[in-house]
Regions:
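The feature captures the conserved acid-bearing segment of alpha/beta-hydrolase catalytic domains
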Residues: 163, 168-255
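Active-site machinery of serine-nucleophile hydrolases
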Residues: 65, 69-123
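Gly/Ser-rich "nucleophile elbow"/oxyanion-hole loop immediately N-terminal to the catalytic nucleophile
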Residues: 56-61, 111-145, 155-158
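A domain-start/cap signature at the N-terminus of enzymes
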Residues: 21-65, 141-143, 183-186, 220-224, ...
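Structural recognition of the beta-strand scaffold that forms the well-ordered cores
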Residues: 50, 65-69, 101-106, 137-141, ...
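Hydrolases whose catalytic domains are alpha/beta-hydrolase-1, hotdog thioesterase
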Residues: 149-153
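Bacterial N-terminal signal peptides
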Residues: 11-22
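Solvent-exposed loop/turn segments at secondary-structure junctions
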Residues: 57, 71-75, 108-112, 144-148, ...
Length: 269
C-alpha cells in the first residue's frame, strides 16, 4: 500500500524533518583528541595553522575554544612550530581528556601579533564554525610575544573573549617597540586605559619573578591597574624561581588554571 503525503499527520512530518536535519548536522564522534592542520587566506596570502580537536567524551557537543598565541621563536610558515612550546606540550600529555578546541595561528617571520589580527580572528572563526565550538566560552592566551598579542587582540575585540591568560606579556617593550600593543602609545597611563576597557573580562596573568626578557613589573602594573579599575576578576601569579619561561609552570603545573578558565562564560549581551 502506497502512503500518500497528505495522509501523514503534520506532527509526524515535522518529526521526520527534524530527524533528517539532526542527522545532517551531527558531529562525528572522536575517540581521542588530535591536532589537525588547516589553512586560511588572509589578504591574498595563505596561512597554515593548527587546531586541536578534543575527544567527544571530553569536549561534548559544543566544546569551549582557546586561542593560543605563540612567542617569537615559533614564527614562520611551517604551520607546526607553534604547537611545540607553551600549551601544546601540555595538551599532548592530555590528548584524551583536554576538553577544549585550541586554535594555533602562526605569525609569519619578522612580524608581530599586532600586524596579524585578521589572521587570528579568521582562524578562530573558521575553527569554531568547523568544529562547533562555543562562542560564549572562547578564551585567549599567549606567551611572551603572544602575551603582548593577548592584550592586543582583547583590545581589538572587547567582549569577544570570556577570559584572558597573558603569560610573561606586557603593553610596551623598550628594546622592541614593534612588539608593543597598538593604539595606546600616546596615553598618559596606558595601564589605566587598558584596565578601563577590559575590566569586565576575567584575567589571570602569569610571570616569572626572575624574567630578564620581559619584566614582571609589567604584569604587576597591569594587575594593579585592573584592580584599581574595579575589575570583575583580576589575578596574577608570579613564580619566584622562574625566568622568562613562566609558561611551563603556568600551563602544566597550575591545575587550578583550567578549573577557573573553563568556568568562565561570556557575559550575556
Amino acid at each position: 500500500m502506497r502512503l500518500r503525503l497528505h495522509q501523514i499527520p503534520l506532527v509526524a512530518m515535522l518529526a521526520m524533518v527534524a530527524c533528517l536535519f539532526t542527522a545532517c548536522m551531527s558531529i562525528p564522534e572522536r575517540a581521542s583528541g588530535s591536532f589537525v592542520e588547516r589553512s586560511i587566506e588572509v589578504a591574498g596570502t595563505s596561512h597554515r595553522y593548527q587546531v586541536f580537536v578534543p575527544a567527544s567524551a571530553a569536549g561534548g557537543r559544543t566544546p569551549p575554544v582557546i586561542v593560543f598565541l605563540h612567542g617569537s621563536g615559533e614564527r614562520g610558515n611551517d604551520g607546526a612550530k607553534q604547537t611545540q612550546v607553551g600549551i601544546g606540550p601540555y595538551i599532548r600529555a592530555h590528548l584524551n581528556d583536554f576538553p577544549a578546541i585550541v586554535v594555533f595561528p602562526q605569525a609569519p617571520d619578522e612580524t608581530e601579533w599586532s600586524g596579524n589580527a585578521d589572521l587570528v580572528f579568521a582562524s578562530l572563526e573558521a575553527a569554531t564554525r568547523e568544529f562547533h565550538g562555543d562562542p560564549d566560552r572562547t578564551y585567549l592566551t599567549g606567551l611572551s610575544m603572544g602575551g603582548y598579542g593577548t592584550w592586543e587582540m582583547a583590545l581589538r575585540a572587547p567582549g569577544r573573549f570570556a577570559a584572558l591568560v597573558p603569560v610573561c606579556g606586557g603593553l610596551a617593550h623598550p628594546r622592541r617597540p614593534s612588539m608593543g600593543v597598538s593604539g595606546i602609545a600616546g596615553a598618559a597611563d596606558p595601564y589605566a586605559v587598558v584596565a578601563a576597557r577590559l575590566k569586565g573580562t576575567p584575567i589571570w596573568q602569569f610571570h616569572g619573578a626572575k624574567d630578564d626578557v620581559v619584566s614582571p613589573d609589567y604584569s604587576r602594573q597591569m594587575d594593579a591597574a585592573l584592580k584599581a579599575a574595579g575589575a570583575r576578576d583580576a589575578r596574577l601569579t608570579v613564580f619566584p624561581e622562574a625566568n622568562h619561561n613562566s609558561w611551563d609552570p603556568a600551563y602544566s603545573q597550575t591545575p587550578e588554571l583550567w578549573t577557573w578558565l573553563f568556568a568562565q562564560r561570556r557575559a550575556t549581551r
